[in-house]
């Protein structure tokens, strides 16, 4: 269902001739507006006047006849009380021939494979897209009245317009609501024809809250910490590119390897271990470490040989003659009998 709003100028205290002239202009504007709107495919038009009260019985019948000659069917007028003023709803039959048929020529009938592919992709996308829910009578009424009130009162907010639409809808009589109910039924039938497999699937309660909480968290993050998305790289992290200069490179100083070349003093200092600082300084080591290690080794030997392995007692078993290289031995010292050749 489509609807269009047409405004009419307010009445003022004028002469009879001027009033007749203005009334004729308003009458022709209302009729022409309904005709144009019907040709565009709209079947409901809201006028910002009380047409029966403004024109009277004879002109109202003439108005219906003029509009009915275009659509071929009689039209119905419904007066709606808007609180501050009245509005007239013009209900016309649906125009299914609003778009002229274009006869395709043989050249236009031929399409390239790429065009056929794009058409098929569009058809698949349209099929995969979820069909919208058909509008009920209140949604259709609110959509039409929103356009009407927005054109008449541009300063109104969306909430104020919704409040006025709700007030007008509750004040309508059953006869005044009948056109909107018929429009909703027509929209439902058209929706069923376009989407025969449509099934209403309401959104889960947690899905809407999750989406709203996600949006609120994202907005809060953008508000509280905008610098997160507006960061800059540190100069130390930016790779530097060597500058290209016209200066010639430094000449190399070749050194000939011969015996006459003297080694400079500063080069000899490079081999001094005291010049370079210790890269890996040694950690202080306790003296008890060596003692503990030696004690562990002796205990392992005692366990293996089942004797008390003591260095002092071991050397006491040997005589001084057995040690040829003892302190104070002569140069012609002979080996003890333990090491003599016995065969």
UniProtKB/Swiss-Prot annotation:
Disordered: annotated segments: 98-117, 177-223
Gene Ontology CC entries for this record: nucleus
DNA-binding residues (ranges): 131-199
Biased composition (Basic residues): 206-218
Keyword set includes Ribonucleoprotein: no
Location(s) in or outside the cell: Nucleus
Principal place of residence: nucleus
Biological process according to GO: cell differentiation; single fertilization
Domain of life: Eukaryota
Alphabetical keyword list: DNA-binding, Fertilization, Nucleus, Transcription, Transcription regulation
PROSITE patterns for the chain: HMG_BOX_2
InterPro entries, A to Z: HMG_box_dom, HMG_box_dom_sf, SRY-related_HMG-box_TF-like
Presence of the UniProt keyword Nucleus in the record: yes
Gene Ontology MF term list: DNA-binding transcription activator activity, RNA polymerase II-specific; RNA polymerase II cis-regulatory region sequence-specific DNA binding
Biased composition (Low complexity): 99-117
Protein known as: Mating-type protein MAT-2
Organism: Cochliobolus heterostrophus
Gene: MAT2
């Amino acid at each position: 269902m489509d609807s269009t709003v047409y405004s009419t100028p307010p009445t003022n205290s004028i002469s009879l001739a001027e009033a007749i002239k203005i009334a004729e202009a308003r009458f022709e504007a209302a009729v022409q507006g309904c005709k144009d709107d019907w040709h565009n495919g709209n079947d409901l038009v809201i006028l910002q006047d009380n047409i029966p009260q403004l024109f009277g019985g004879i002109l109202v019948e003439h108005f219906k006849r003029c509009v009915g000659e275009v659509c071929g069917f009689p039209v119905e007028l419904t007066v709606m009380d808007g609180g501050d003023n009245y509005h007239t709803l013009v209900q016309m039959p649906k125009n299914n021939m609003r778009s002229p048929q274009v006869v395709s020529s043989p050249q236009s009938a031929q399409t390239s494979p790429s065009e056929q592919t794009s058409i098929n992709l569009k058809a698949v996308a349209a099929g995969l897209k979820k069909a919208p829910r058909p509008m009920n009578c209140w949604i259709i009424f609110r959509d039409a009245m929103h356009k009407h009130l927005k054109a008449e009162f541009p300063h109104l907010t969306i909430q104020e317009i919704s409040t006025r639409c709700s007030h007008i809808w509750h004040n309508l009589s059953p006869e005044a609501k009948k056109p909107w109910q018929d429009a909703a039924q027509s929209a439902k039938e058209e929706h069923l024809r376009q989407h025969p497999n449509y099934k209403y699937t309401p959104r889960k309660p947690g899905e809407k809250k999750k989406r709203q909480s996600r949006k609120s968290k994202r907005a809060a993050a953008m508000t509280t910490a905008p610098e997160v998305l507006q960061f800059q790289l540190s100069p130390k992290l930016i790779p530097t590119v060597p500058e290209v200069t016209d200066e010639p490179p430094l000449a190399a100083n070749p050194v000939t390897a011969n015996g006459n070349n003297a080694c400079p003093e500063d080069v000899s200092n490079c081999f001094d271990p005291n010049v370079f600082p210790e890269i890996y300084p040694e950690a202080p080591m306790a003296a008890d470490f060596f003692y503990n290690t030696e004690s562990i080794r002796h205990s392992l030997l005692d366990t293996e040989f089942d004797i008390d392995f003591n260095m002092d007692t071991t050397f006491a078993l040997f005589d001084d003659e057995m040690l040829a290289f003892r302190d104070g031995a002569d140069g012609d010292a002979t080996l003890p009998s333990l090491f003599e050749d016995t065969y």
